[in-house]
Amino acid sequence: MLLPLKVLGQVKLQDVTISGKQPKFVRLKGYYRSYQHNDSLLKYYVDGIVEYYINLKNEKVYLRIYGCRYLRNEELISKDKKRAFMLSDQATFRPWPEGTTFIEECRKKYTIQDSANVGYIKKKGQNIGRITTDSIRKCCTIEMDMVPTYDKLSQNIFGFSQEIVSDKFTEAYRLSDEDYYSFKNLIFQKTDQSYNYWHKKDSHKQLIHVVTELFITEQEYVDEKKKESGINLQPQEATQAIENYMSVHGLPLLPPEEQAEMKKLQFYDPAKL
């Protein structure tokens, strides 16, 4: 996957020279969006400006939110069949960087066969991903097919079933002089998952497709996290803040067809559901 040059050019990194005392946190600030289609119709959309503090010692993550929007298609939701026991079909989520980067996890779990600017990720001899280095864009990208890593592709609970169709994961990092990539190098993350979803009494399986993207715009080492909480904005205020943030940092908009579908969605408060 190629990242927009504009995005890569807007990444603001504040590396520091460390002597003696080690920093306590990596601070990441950026924008995320997560949206879900049911049978090709946009049903849920969430996005926001987020700031993460990752503790370098115990790997705990602290989150501050500067503005977040929750939207859904009320017409589609009104058509959902009512069951005695209901499970929400919403699968959008907020990215949560913790532990080690995905590329480091792959180095621990799988074999990586290096070849020029491309490293192939293998599980039991099968190619399941690749790591690509781009010296022009000065980034390293890992792309992974997650399906071969699953023990099983389907699960059932309370009469509802889910069957994985595809699951792709991408992370991109700024090129580093080090021989590994930490969160201080992270600039982009994406998951793209599709699965069939149905109730045992349904005659039709819904195809659910969820895409979640995280664009990192600021990174730095810090000795302490901010004590104040995030900013809780009303929907219209959050919309203005997000649009301004995306414009300032040159972040890519959704494709025109997705933007048109968003006009059919309504704001909602998840705390009141």
Give short role names for the model-derived ranges.
Residues 11-273:
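Surface-exposed, low-complexity/disordered segments
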